[in-house]
Amino acid sequence: NLSIVARKTGAKMVQISTDDVFDGIRHTPYTEFDDTNPKTVYGRSKRAGENYVKEFTHKHFILRSNWVYGNGNNFVNRVLHAADTKDELLVASDQFGSPTSAKDLARIILYLIQTNEYGTYHATCQGVCNRYEFAQEILKLAGKQINLRPVMTSESDLSSARPAYAVLDNFILRIINVYDMPEWKTSLREYMNERTEG
């Protein structure tokens, strides 16, 4: 296990975690000090991973994020693929979160590993939206047309069972004043521009 190796060698360890460690039943953002209460197998496995890291090495950075996108299979790319292959897309309007680019998450990690500010952090872009609003913005920036319909998660083409309110408060990042995460629409626009240029 990497946490055991980190302890033996004195290395710093970064563990990427998720909003799924919370139950998502309330309507205010979760801070690093809120009790975890995962409702899915995935969430329970991520919490177990967090606990394992905490147990075996104190030189750890646990970063919880959500709705992360970049290269590979993620919500942004699935929406864009659907726009190219379908006439209609049903998207959940009852799941709320903060879309976060992998690039912004990487910036936080690169900063933290140069410090000894060990602990658990929430790291998401600023602002809140639902999946339907997220899809609307993706399609607008891509200049693509598709009949987009807001539905409940159970009817959605893209969303699986996730916490309904997956909003994280970057409380500790604000306290240590390291890096202001951008607004989610700003970050998404940057990502989409890079896709076009690439």
PLM regions: where:
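C-terminal amphipathic/interface module of NAD(P)-dependent oxidoreductases
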Residues: 146, 164-198
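Active-site "gating" loop of Rossmann-like NAD(P)-dependent oxidoreductase/epimerase domains
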Residues: 16-40
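NAD(P)-dependent short-chain dehydrogenase/reductase
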Residues: 51-97, 104
